[in-house]
Regions:
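Outer-membrane beta-barrel pore domains
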Residues: 1-189
């Protein structure tokens, strides 16, 4: 054999279930993401046919091909890799690519005119192999959203079917640099 086989150590596992018909709770999403291993620290590996192989320290998103993993400082692919745009030192590398995270999403459609969803994520970061944090950093992100679709005989025709959506979001912890809050109001058809 001219290859080396390794156990899976880093994972992104997800589960989604949709209930039918629509109800107060009609969708559940759970995700688990583990990126702390990254082939482990540097080690020398070999077999009878591969005389020398150096592995480890994969450094996810930091393979010095930056245009492939970010665009204008924003991470592409997974939002849990904190974007280089937020680096206080001006570098374009990802400072927290070794972490474990849990994500939960819930959604419902209790009537023809009302929808809601909730998203919550917990993350524990270690930094990188090259620049580890001196202590673990934690973060919690939450978002709640409700949508009401306008309807009824007294409404002007142009207002019927318009969605009015209100969202509230917050994150707390050291990974995203402090506590942040926001609200959003959306009107769309």
């Amino acid at each position: 054999h001219r290859y080396l086989l390794y156990d899976f150590k880093d994972w992104m596992l997800g589960f989604e279930y949709r209930f039918k018909p629509d109800n107060w709770l009609n969708s559940i999403v759970f995700e688990y993401l583990y990126t702390k291993y990254q082939s482990g620290p540097i080690y020398h590996d070999h077999t009878l046919t591969v005389p020398d192989h150096i592995g480890g320290r994969d450094d996810f998103y930091n393979h010095y091909i930056f245009p492939g993993y970010q665009h204008w400082g924003q991470a592409m692919g997974n939002p849990l890799y904190r974007s280089p745009l937020y680096n206080e030192d001006g570098t374009v590398e990802f400072h927290n690519n070794r972490f474990v995270a849990f994500h939960l999403g819930l959604g419902g459609h209790p009537s023809d005119y009302v929808k809601w969803r909730f998203l919550g994520t917990w993350q524990e970061g270690l930094g990188t192999y090259e620049k580890p944090y001196t202590k673990k950093h934690h973060n919690v992100s939450l978002m709640g959203e409700a949508t009401y679709t306008l309807h009824g005989g007294r409404l002007p025709e142009w207002l019927k079917g318009v969605d009015v959506r209100m969202g509230v979001g917050a994150d707390f912890g050291a990974i995203l640099r402090g506590n942040n809050y926001g609200i959003q109001l959306t009107v769309c058809k």
